[in-house]
Structures are given as C-alpha cells and as structure tokens.
Regions:
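Conserved positions in beta-strands of structured domains
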Residues: 15-18, 82, 87, 101-103, ...
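Active-site helix/loop of acyl-thioester processing domains in fatty-acid/polyketide metabolism
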Residues: 17, 48-71
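Short, Lys/Arg-enriched N-terminal segments with co-localized hydrophobic residues
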Residues: 1-8
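Hydrophobic beta-strand-centered segment that forms part of the acyl-chain substrate-binding groove
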Residues: 60-97, 132-134, 140
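Hydrophobic core residues within well-ordered beta-strands of beta-rich domains
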Residues: 11-13, 96, 110
Length: 176
C-alpha cells in the first residue's frame, strides 16, 4: 500500500487539525496543483478526485479513533461508506474542511457522520458542501488473527504516533 509497506498511507489527506474532542474532529486538506493525481483528474480542469475526498474523511475519522484509544490498534480502514453525496469541486488553491462526528463504537470499529466543505473563494466565510457520507471504519491489529504479525502492529502503531506528532505540531495553536 504505497512505498512505505503494508498499512502505510501513501497520500496524507489531512494537513491540519482545527478541533479534536472525544466525539468530533475537524481537519483540513489543502489542495495543491503539485499533487500528482491532479495531472490526470482532469488535465484541463484539475479537481480533487471524489475518492480522495472520501479518503480525507476516512483519515480524519481514523485519527479520531487513534486518539480516543491512545493508538491501541495499528489499522483503521474504511469498511463501508453509505449515503455518499458529492456537491461542489475542490480545486487547487482550495481547502477541503472535514468535520467528522462519532456516531457509534463497537468492539471492531466505529461509525461516523462526515461532511467536507469548501469555501466559496469570496472571503465572506460561506462554504459549500463538497461531500457528505456515513462511514464505518474497522479498527484492529493484524496480530489478532495472525500472531506472527504482532511486531508489524507495534511498528505501525509507532509510525502512526510519529505521523500524529508531526500533524499535531502543524496544528499547534489548536488544542489537540
């Protein structure tokens, strides 16, 4: 899954945390023309692909799970996306503001209500919905089913803690 090996995220689609509580996270994904996937989506009208917007919601929800559990599990992956509705585009120079609210936790994951908005570019503070969805994440350790992978779980949890430390530092003025 990317150059870093199994379970390592290739595309980091959360650039900043604006708010974090036990039940809710607000994060931002800044869109730059330098992002490689924009070259093909679409060459004359580059916009953040819908699947990447959904992944941004998923990554924000994963950070909420990791923080709630003090990084108890190595894997937080999208299990199901329901009622996904796309609205406006997110173009380079724009920002996708992601709000994810915890709906329900289970022994194996959690469900969330999530929405991504983008400013109208007029500087008046109004925004439009880029997407909304109800998502379910599975939260687990690989070693739970294959004990030989317990060491990989430890490495992945440590990797996630290091990524969180960088993200937290970039969001320092916010209580995260």
């Amino acid at each position: 899954m990317g150059r870093g090996g199994a379970g390592v995220v290739k595309f980091n689609l959360v650039d900043r945390i604006e708010h974090l509580s036990d039940e809710r996270i607000v994060a931002v994904k800044y869109v730059s023309l330098a992002e490689e996937y924009l070259a093909d989506h679409f060459p004359t009208f580059p916009v953040l692909p819908g699947v990447m917007m959904l992944e941004s919601l998923t990554q924000a929800a994963a950070w909420l799970l990791h923080k709630r559990t003090d990084f108890a599990c190595s894997m937080a992956v999208l299990k199901e996306a329901r009622n996904v509705k796309y609205g406006t585009f997110v173009a380079p120079g724009g920002a996708l503001r992601v709000e994810v609210e915890l709906n329900k936790t289970t022994d194996t994951g959690a469900t969330f209500k999530a929405v991504g908005t983008v400013g109208d570019g007029n500087g008046n503070g109004s925004s439009a919905v880029a997407l909304q969805a109800r998502i379910e994440l599975a939260y687990f350790n690989l070693g739970d089913k294959q004990p030989a992978l317990a060491e990989l779980d430890r490495q992945l949890r440590e990797h996630n803690r290091r990524r969180w430390a960088v993200l937290r530092a970039q969001s320092a003025e916010v209580a995260v």
